[in-house]
């Protein structure tokens, strides 16, 4: 398995010490333009990207970058540059959660789908208790000329490796391994007992198409079956954590594509786009392994870093505004992180 501590420290060594802060051993904050900062990250070294870029459509002056682009196309071109870098730095089995507005969702997905498999589009409903509903309760309904945008979107995606929907790195590797040792998909299905009845598994054809991912037990059976045929030792098989995209949910989590997490209530010093810790934890727990590296390229006040630390992950936060860099440093230094793993 990849030595995550070594990878993490290697990544951080590439940044200027004047703009790098380490409020916790496993939490780093880098000040600057994340599009440029990402170029210093080695390829295929980040496990999960969880990030909240400017929405553009909301046009809020108190969010850096939200009013930067006059045309939608300029904003989309800018975001496409991020997508290219995200794919380069993500591990082959990495994932991305990218927040966006409902208005820009489809245009962004169109750009992202050039480099990523769009696995889900999550609707965050933002429910709140009476008295904390903001403009939803106060605004005059008769003035509406379209449905009130009470939700936000989160695009969940993984790097695409092929020309068809869902083509994945593992799927391509499995097919090449099978061809190398001359074992049919049907025979491998028989050996592993994966007939598609288990949602986490699916038949070999589904794994190769990228529609499903094998469980740890199924992957072990795959490797053992292939090793018997690989008499010349031609194949080096990665550990499960280095090739299978993590996706681990249970009944205690929000596991559908509708997420109901209350918004962060107003407090002195609150970031205008701050996301709730429990929502971020839901994504991190599902789509990363313990000790993985989580990157937020628009980190704001450091919520993603706090959520990552609480689940035993390492974090790298990139933020362009010095005000929020300092707020993040203070937050992570003073917050008592409760480990939830």
Task: Put a short name on every predicted segment.
Residues 76, 333-339:
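Conserved phosphoryl-transfer catalytic core
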Residues 324, 340-341:
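Charged C-terminal helix
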Residues 1-10, 14-318, 323-325:
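Core catalytic lobe of class I
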């Amino acid at each position: 398995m990849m030595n995550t501590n070594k990878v993490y420290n290697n990544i951080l060594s590439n940044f200027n010490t004047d703009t790098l802060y380490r409020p916790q051993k496993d939490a780093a904050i880098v000040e600057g333009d994340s599009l440029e900062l990402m170029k210093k990250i080695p390829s295929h070294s980040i496990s999960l990207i969880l990030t909240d870029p400017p929405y553009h459509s909301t046009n809020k002056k108190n969010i850096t970058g939200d009013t930067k682009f006059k045309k939608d196309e300029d904003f989309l071109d800018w975001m496409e540059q991020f997508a290219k870098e995200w794919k380069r730095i993500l591990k082959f089995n990495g994932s991305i959660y990218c927040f966006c507005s409902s208005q820009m969702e489809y245009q962004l997905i169109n750009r992202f789908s050039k480099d990523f498999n769009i696995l889900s589009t999550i609707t965050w409903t933002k429910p709140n208790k009476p008295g904390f509903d903001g403009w939803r309760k106060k605004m005059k309904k008769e003035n509406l000329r379209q449905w009130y945008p009470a939700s936000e979107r989160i695009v969940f995606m993984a790097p695409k490796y092929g020309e068809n929907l869902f083509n994945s790195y593992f799927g391509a590797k499995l097919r090449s391994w099978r061809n190398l040792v001359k074992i049919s998909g049907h025979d491998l299905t028989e050996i592993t007992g994966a007939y598609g009845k288990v949602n986490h598994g699916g038949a070999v054809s589904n794994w190769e198409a990228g529609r499903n991912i094998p469980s740890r037990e199924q992957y072990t059976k795959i490797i053992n079956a292939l090793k018997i045929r690989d008499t010349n030792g031609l194949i080096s098989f990665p550990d499960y954590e280095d090739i299978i995209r993590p996706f681990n949910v249970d009944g205690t989590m929000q596991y559908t594509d509708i997420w109901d997490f209350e918004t962060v209530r107003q407090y002195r010093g609150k970031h205008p786009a701050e996301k709730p810790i429990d929502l971020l934890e839901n994504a991190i727990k599902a789509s990363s392994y313990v000790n993985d590296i989580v990157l937020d390229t628009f980190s704001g006040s450091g919520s993603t870093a706090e959520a990552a630390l609480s689940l035993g992950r390492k974090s790298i936060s990139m933020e362009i505004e010095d005000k929020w860099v300092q707020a993040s440093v203070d937050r992570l230094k003073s917050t008592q992180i409760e480990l939830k793993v």
